[in-house]
Amino acid sequence: MSVMQNNSEKSKWFLPGILGGLATTMKHLLKNLFNQKKMMTLNYPEEKYEYSPRFKGNHVLTVKKDGSLRCTACMLCATNCPAECIKITAAEHNDPTVEKFPISYEIDILRCVFCGFCEEACPVDAIRLGPEWQTPGVNGANFIYDINHLAYRPNLKGGILTHVDDEERHKAGI
């Protein structure tokens, strides 16, 4: 019994598989060509996908009603971040009732895994994962977001206010 097989017999084995694959491809091509309204593809720049309200996109620093940052530079978000992508530099505040505030708050989006641990760790609701997800950029420096980008970018229309006011927090003991 010979282990070697004839080349003509070997080529016959592949022919049904190739023809089956071509038939499947042609079936999908014709179906999509003549039923374009049923296609799942969106024309991206013109049409946008509707995401759930629970969608977690790019980070947002929330602001108070007076326009200042809600962040108290407690470093809990940076400590809780598994990717170690949050860098905060704190400074003392001029107001004696405020202990400290962030003078530098940076998030390296290329390292971030969008887990939401920073959002959960924050005791003052200062950081959230917002509804935006598009992050175009040319080089790596464009993906390190600072305070101005996180809290005051133009498409946020002046920042995102928190759900609970300071007075309501104080009454609730938060």
From Swiss-Prot:
Q: Which residues form the 4Fe-4S ferredoxin-type domain?
A: 61-91, 103-132
Q: Can you quote the record's cofactor note?
A: Binds 2 [4Fe-4S] clusters per subunit.
Alphabetically sorted, this entry's keywords are: 4Fe-4S, Cell inner membrane, Cell membrane, Iron, Iron-sulfur, Membrane, Metal-binding, NAD, Quinone, Repeat, Translocase, Ubiquinone
Q: Does the keyword Translocase apply?
A: yes
- MF terms per GO, please? 4 iron, 4 sulfur cluster binding; iron ion binding; NADH:ubiquinone reductase (non-electrogenic) activity; quinone binding
- Gene3D superfamilies linked: 3.30.70.3270
Q: What is its EC number?
A: 7.1.1.-
Q: Which top-level group of life is the source organism from? A: Bacteria
> Which residues make up the binding site for [4Fe-4S] cluster 2?
C81, C112, C115, C118
Topology class, membrane: Peripheral membrane protein
Cellular component, GO annotation:
plasma membrane
Q: Which residues form a coiled coil?
A: none
Subcellular location field: Cell inner membrane
Stored PANTHER family: NADH DEHYDROGENASE UBIQUINONE IRON-SULFUR PROTEIN 8, MITOCHONDRIAL (PTHR10849)
Q: How does it assemble?
A: NDH-1 is composed of 14 different subunits. Subunits NuoA, H, J, K, L, M, N constitute the membrane sector of the complex.
Please report which protein family the annotation says this sequence is part of.
Belongs to the complex I 23 kDa subunit family.
Enumerate the HAMAP family for this protein: NDH1_NuoI
- Provide the protein name: NADH-quinone oxidoreductase subunit I
Q: List the source organism.
A: Bdellovibrio bacteriovorus (strain ATCC 15356 / DSM 50701 / NCIMB 9529 / HD100)
State which gene encodes it. Answer: nuoI
